[in-house]
Amino acid sequence: SQVYGALIMSIAGALFEHRINDPKTGVFVNSQMDSYRLPRLGDIGELIVHLHEPESERARGVIGLGEPPVISGCAAISNAVCNATGVRVPTLPFTPKRVLDAMRTAKG
C-alpha cells in the first residue's frame, strides 16, 4: 500500500539515503547504485499501520494518503534520536557522524 511505501521511504530518508556532492562542481559523487545506500529488506522492521476512517471522511471519496507518512516518519525518528541523545540533529540522514557532531556542539 501507499502507506507502507511511504513509511519505508521515510526510514530510508532519515537513516540511509545520503547524497554526497562534490563541493566544487555540485555533481553527485555517489549517484550509482553501488555507492548510494538504500535500505534492504532486513533493515526495515515490522510495520504496523492502523487507519482511522470516520464515515464522514469516506463520504468525500478517494483522498491522498501516501505523502503524510513520509514527513511524520522522519519527524518520529528525529524525536527518537533526540530522546536518546538529548540533542537535535538538524540534517537528514542521521548518520553517526552527524549525531556525534550534534552531541559535541551541545556540550560546547
Summary of predicted features, one role per range:
Residues S1-G108:
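C-terminal catalytic domains of large/alpha subunits in multi-subunit enzymes
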